Swiss-Prot record:
InterPro entries: AAA+_ATPase, GAF, GAF-like_dom_sf, Homeodomain-like_sf, NorR, P-loop_NTPase, Sigma_54_int, Sigma_54_int_dom_ATP-bd_1. ATP binds at residues 215-222, 278-287. Transmembrane segments: none annotated. This is Anaerobic nitric oxide reductase transcription regulator NorR. It comes from the Bacteria. Pathway: Nitrogen metabolism; nitric oxide reduction. Gene3D superfamilies: 1.10.8.60, 3.30.450.40, Homeodomain-like, P-loop containing nucleotide triphosphate hydrolases. SUPFAM superfamilies: GAF domain-like, Homeodomain-like, P-loop containing nucleoside triphosphate hydrolases. The modification 4-aspartylphosphate is found at residue 57. GO terms for molecular function: ATP binding; ATP hydrolysis activity; DNA binding; DNA-binding transcription factor activity. SMART domains: AAA, GAF.
Amino acid sequence: MSFSVEVLAGIAIELQRGIGHQDRFQRLITTLRQVLACDASALLRYESRQFIPLAIDGLAQDVLGRRFTLEGHPRLEAIARAGDVVRFPADSDLPDPYDGLIPGQESLKVHACVGLPLFAGQNLIGALTLDAMTPEQFEVFSDEELRLVAALAAGALSNALLIEQLESQNMLPGSSGVFEPIKETHMIGLSPAMTQLKKEIEIVAGSDLNVLIGGETGTGKELVAKAIHQSSPRAVNPLVYLNCAALPESVAESELFGHVKGAFTGAISNRSGKFEMADNGTLFLDEIGELSLALQAKLLRVLQYGDIQRVGDDRSLRVDVRVLAATNRDLREEVLAGRFRADLFYRLSVFPLFVPPLRERGDDVVLLAGYFCEQCRLRLGLSRVVLSPGARRHLLNYGWPGNVRELEHAIHRAVVLARATRAGDEVVLEEQHFALSEDVLPAPSAESFLALPACRNLRESTENFQREMIRQALAQNNHNWAASARALETDVANLHRLAKRLGLKD
């Protein structure tokens, strides 16, 4: 069988019928798999010497989370270098990247493979891979026919990447206008929750607003900060990271704002702080809720006026810094308890983002597992690391209280265990290789983190916030003022006075 004009026209029509790029990509490879009667097809994007799966058909779901480096996959490297159709013989010594990843045939090797590099002009932007268990499957199709398919796919991918680039505001003022693929930030996931988060990141990235990123421990808040920075006009300048929880009080101010020689014992020279390092760029303050009230006041001044003072220096320095902050605490409760400044909270949370916990991300668990499996494979020098069907079900049924970080550690541990019990360099992860426990402390929900009262000014915002927290405390404590005061960690007399001022009691 060979391609007819009708078949090629059908493929082109399918590319136009999809709603959104992802749907078009999926239609393309599904149609190709049917036309070619092969066992698996995949559309991959090329970036930084690796191929990133965009859509698959006939392959295990975790393939979408894997990142295939050229160094780790000789067949994909051959496709990237070829510039034309690549046919791998059935007896090729080069391992297939999808060995063990075709459902129902995990123990069998892929026999026939065709690779089609995709170009935008002279730039490699991706590849189509076609795999079959029958060695002669692709012999009836000529190279010219396969080139036509590659041209259709390359056009669709090139247009999609260009639109993505424009939508993400990567065509910045003063840029050359040359097409450049978007750099990946490893925010892996196709669930509705992650899709919504990515949309919100796109919305806020092009602005200069401060962003407060909330979410449970281990959800990937730092990746969100990186994604915002890389998609912003400040991407050409530094993204500076500071973990506020790891700062001793004695050096915290110096870390943030710098110091001059002789400012304190041990200050043997002038030193720039994180704000100076991030000038014209972005400063990411992780665990912002751990800062002392004194430092919060100084941070607020920087956000308000854009100037800093080094420790021991009376002069002010102007800085242009965008601040991204992250926390796993409910800062509204921290404000009411007097541990976090209300004015700073509202300054930071101009555009709040909430990173969903892994248990709310559905099949993203499997995609992330595939990503970590591929990392382990490269790190340990293994030929392949795959998940058994039972292991996939086990991962999907678990609650993941430690979120993505727990999944990463679980995969790494399982690979080590599986490798120890099986000879050779091929590892299959089974259910028994995972020892999972769901003991975890509660964390704030998306609703509690994102809810901000509508208001006209900071004072009104603060009073509305305090009023709502007092109402909640009273409702939860049967309107017992003493119990409510204890819950809010304040004196009952002060609570009465505050409630009276806010109009909650006569």
